[in-house]
Regions:
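Peptidyl-prolyl cis-trans isomerase
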Residues: 2-247
């Protein structure tokens, strides 16, 4: 392999790739480029992507474009492949995973709902109960109690956390929040070494809008790519790639 004036033997490159733990990432890129070739964007679509890229990076001048490519050791075809890959992967994911996406969304919806909640945690059960009574009776605001007494990082935000997907929370915590109504304050409960006070501020049900659709398609694509790389690393023969071109 030669990069400008630097020449490296191919066997040395192989060793470097292994020692740098780059075998899996390189295999993943190989699979992505195989998918790109399988999808086969037409020249008009690639031209549009290239023009948009050149305008965004102020590379419409040929001299600037050539210098940009030379700096990276790329050819013009390398750039077109680089620009084609995200769109090709997007189309591949849509065709492969799109038909079952609604069912997949419904299966995961409980973890995709986002929640805004207030949390106060202490180690002393007596203090937890005393604070719960004071907050419940309006003697002290939750925010003030959390800022003063909470032993976790939520003290800096006066107890307020989120919004975040329920699936990112500790399962016990997420389960408790699922069963609260907005504004409900739970009595002190123990989770691990902590006694918690929880109040649900807002629960936002996930919707299968375009942003959610693209997120789920990307997640499924990543899972598929990683599984294919694992099979290649294990010496297995992966399934043949298929993509049906639109008429």
């Amino acid at each position: 392999m030669q990069f400008r004036s630097w020449i490296v033997d191919s066997t040395e490159i192989e060793g470097l790739i292994r020692r740098a733990d780059q075998v899996a990432p390189l295999l993943k890129r190989c699979v992505e480029e195989q998918v790109t070739a399988c999808v086969g964007l037409d020249a008009e679509a690639i031209d549009a992507l290239e023009q948009q890229f050149l305008e965004q990076h102020k590379l419409e001048d040929e001299k600037a474009r050539v210098a940009w490519l030379e700096q990276r050791g790329w050819s013009a075809d390398d750039l077109r492949l680089h620009l084609s890959r995200p769109e090709a992967l997007k189309r591949f994911a849509e065709q492969r995973f799109g038909p079952g996406l609604e069912e997949h969304f419904l299966q995961r919806k409980g973890n995709l709902d986002t929640v805004l909640y207030s949390l106060l945690r202490v180690r002393d059960p007596g203090l937890a109960r005393e604070l719960w009574i004071q907050i419940s009776e309006g003697e002290v605001r939750f925010e003030d109690a959390a800022a003063r007494h909470s032993d976790g990082p939520e003290a800096r935000s006066r107890g307020l956390l989120g919004p975040m997907p329920l699936g990112q929370l500790q399962p016990e915590l997420a389960e408790r929040l699922r069963h609260l109504q907005q504004g409900d304050l739970r009595p002190p409960e123990r989770i691990g070494p902590w006694w918690l006070l929880l109040r649900l501020e807002q629960l936002n049900p996930a919707r299968l809008d375009d942003a959610m659709r693209q997120r789920l398609l990307q997640e499924q694509l990543e899972t598929w790519l990683n599984a294919r790389v694992e099979s290649l690393l294990a010496g297995e023969q992966p399934e043949e790639l298929h993509y049906h071109q639109s008429p």
